[in-house]
């Protein structure tokens, strides 16, 4: 009887501890995102920063549609390259910095010894390759996580590769460390890696999650920095958190501080909020129960605008939404059919992406937007053709006076689900010249990009909403209700208020 009582008390304490440390958290967890430029001296000119960012955006988008990769069932766009998150894995107190990427579904980082092929032109990692802690364990070949890492390959095949005896495979007895998950290959749009799957504890502020699964890579191609995948797959960070704590894993949001490549602004932390839910008093914009007695415009500006996530059979980890059109001033330009829906082959839709800098649109739709924009701005300001090739952006203009820029509104699917972008999110102004060759002049560029002809995009993503256009918004990924929301925020102030 005494033994039973002790055992009961022991298990109760364990349950209480686990419940307290993971499941009972009713408040969101706040993490900070740092821009990759914040770790550098950031002495590059605006033109150089624009060119490098536009080149990365184009590569991340276009290489996803490369014909040589069409045979692959599921391929992330590319690893993210703008915002870094710091995580602590295992018993070691040291943290590892990873790119936050909503376009992929795996958490991985470089492990010692580490070799990166073709990384000479890549940014230096903010932290050295990690060593596995003594508490790390290999994931067995029969684990569902192993199958997920191997693109849903059956566990029987994986265990056969791991030399698990046939009778063990038939009886399901391969679930030991003696038969680990085989190394897996993971490809991005412009890089790849080979890694092994491990399990260890994940430490976040106020919470520790046991049995967290991650990839440990000893060799990569053009990928010197690890990635925290926040996509919709089984191995993503939100999905694994949801297993331990639905509150933390069923919703997350970030609020990217508006920086315009300014060296001071780019060093401000941007809040990443795990377990962020819309307050019950804060009504969803565009629903039938949205009946305000007063016309409080300020309150409405702070409300979330939601649009439903689209299901993608080919890329199930993407946060794809339906774009109905874009307004330039008072003119609404309808979006092509491929941006409104996803076809049976997984083509189309707009991916809300944290890892691509600039928004990419299909050529015909992009040209219609540019034509309307240019008809309003170009009739007053001289076109800066010389700057466009060196910036990667178009159109650009010389600004000799105060420029009147038409409003730009994104119309997503859903009743009143429209998002008005702040001017700085789509029109970048900077000084160029003054080097003795050209006089110093003020220039402004439209910050949208041509993603290529629709014929080239078939079977792949139709468009991408880049992180530059997401600045100054809290973007919430409501995984429980399968929707994405946008609300205007002063992100730097939000960080200060939530700390």
Swiss-Prot record:
Any Pfam family: TAXi_C
Glycosylation sites per record: 175, 211, 400, 415
GO MF term (any one): aspartic-type endopeptidase activity
Active site: 101, 353
Keyword Hydrolase attached: yes
UniProt EC number: 3.4.23.-
Domain of life (superkingdom): Eukaryota
Listed InterPro entries: Aspartic_peptidase_AS, Pepsin-like_plant, PEPTIDASE_A1, Peptidase_aspartic_dom_sf, Plant_Aspart_Prot_A1, TAXi_C, TAXi_N
Enzyme class: hydrolase
Disulfide bridge positions per record: 111-119, 396-445
A cellular-component GO term for this protein: plant-type cell wall
Signal peptide: 1-26
Domain Peptidase A1: 83-487
GO biological process, one term: proteolysis
Swiss-Prot/TrEMBL keywords: Aspartyl protease, Disulfide bond, Glycoprotein, Hydrolase, Protease, Signal
Family designation: Belongs to the peptidase A1 family.
Name this polypeptide is given: Probable aspartyl protease At4g16563
Source organism per UniProt: Arabidopsis thaliana
